[in-house]
Every structure is written in C-alpha cells, then in structure tokens.
Amino acid sequence: MNALLTPDYGLIFWTIVNFLLLVFLLGKFAWKPIIGALEARENKISQDKKDAQEARDEAQKIKAELDVRLSNISKEAQEKLAQVEALAKQQKDAMIKDAQASSERMIATAKEEIEAQKNQALKEVKKEIADMAVEAAAKIAGVKTDPKTDAALVDNIVKDIINKA
C-alpha cells in the first residue's frame, strides 16, 4: 500500500507525456469539429431567437391591425344600426301619420254620409208629414186645396216641428 502513496517519477513523466499527446491529438483532430459544432449550434440558437422575436413582432403588428379593423367594424356596425333604427322610426312615424290621415278621411267620409242620410231622412219625413197633413186637412175641411197652398202649409208645419225638436 505504501507503493501507491510514493510517487514514481517515471510514471509521472509518462502520464504527463500521454496527457500532452492526448491534448495534441484532440486539438489536432477533435477540437475543431467540436468547436465548429458548438458555434453552429450557438448560431442556430441565436438565429432561432431572432426569428422568434421577428415572428412575435409581426404577430403583435398583425394583432394591432386586427384590433384597429375590429374597432372600425364595430363603429361601422353601430352606425349602420343607428341608421336602421332611424329609418325604422321614420317609417313607423310615416305609417302612423298615414294611418291617422286615413282614419280622419274615413271619419270625415262617415260624417258626410251620416249628414247626407240625415238630410235624406228629413226630406222623406218632411214629405210624409206634408202628405199626411194635406190628407188630414182635406179630410177635416172636406175641401181639396191647390198644391201651392199645400206646400206652404207643409213647410210651416215642418218648420214648427223641427224648431220644437
């Protein structure tokens, strides 16, 4: 066990020579490909980061444009809705106005018809009253009178009846 703790200068010399030879061979054949691979990997990672940042920036730009478009579309929709509501209100008001005018015309026409029927009924009643009055007067008096006198008498009677009513 003592031999392991005691340094052997020959062994140390050959270990150093082997180590230096290993370093030389690694440097000559392995370090360049390893460093090249590491640099390539580093460049790829750097490029991927740059591409990701550009993609993120582009996405944010597109999002901002879409937000502006959405805002504009929303404003246009609100304006269209307001226009449609205004048009609907105008049409409703026009329909109400037309309906009122139509009902007023119908009422006026009905009043005219009622007045015409009333006048016609009054004429008929006046004629019947006149005929009855002439017949009654002729029966009471037992005399036949002329049509002018009959008409004047009937007019007076009808006027009296209308004034009393």
Swiss-Prot record:
Superkingdom field: Bacteria
Subcellular localization, as worded in the UniProt entry: Cell membrane
Any one GO molecular-function label of the UniProt entry: proton-transporting ATP synthase activity, rotational mechanism
Keywords tagged on the record: ATP synthesis, Cell membrane, CF(0), Hydrogen ion transport, Ion transport, Membrane, Transmembrane, Transmembrane helix, Transport
CDD domains: ATP-synt_Fo_b
Transmembrane segments: 11-31
Coiled-coil regions listed: none
Pfam families on file: ATP-synt_B (PF00430)
Keyword flag Chloroplast: no
One GO cellular component term: proton-transporting ATP synthase complex
Membrane topology: Single-pass membrane protein
Keyword field contains NAD: no
Main location: membrane
Family of this protein: Belongs to the ATPase B chain family.
Subunit organization: F-type ATPases have 2 components, F(1) - the catalytic core - and F(0) - the membrane proton channel. F(1) has five subunits: alpha(3), beta(3), gamma(1), delta(1), epsilon(1). F(0) has three main subunits: a(1), b(2) and c(10-14). The alpha and beta chains form an alternating ring which encloses part of the gamma chain. F(1) is attached to F(0) by a central stalk formed by the gamma and epsilon chains, while a peripheral stalk is formed by the delta and b chains.
Task performed by this protein: F(1)F(0) ATP synthase produces ATP from ADP in the presence of a proton or sodium gradient. F-type ATPases consist of two structural domains, F(1) containing the extramembraneous catalytic core and F(0) containing the membrane proton channel, linked together by a central stalk and a peripheral stalk. During catalysis, ATP synthesis in the catalytic domain of F(1) is coupled via a rotary mechanism of the central stalk subunits to proton translocation.
Protein name: ATP synthase subunit b
Organism in which the protein naturally occurs: Elusimicrobium minutum (strain Pei191)
Protein encoded by which gene: atpF
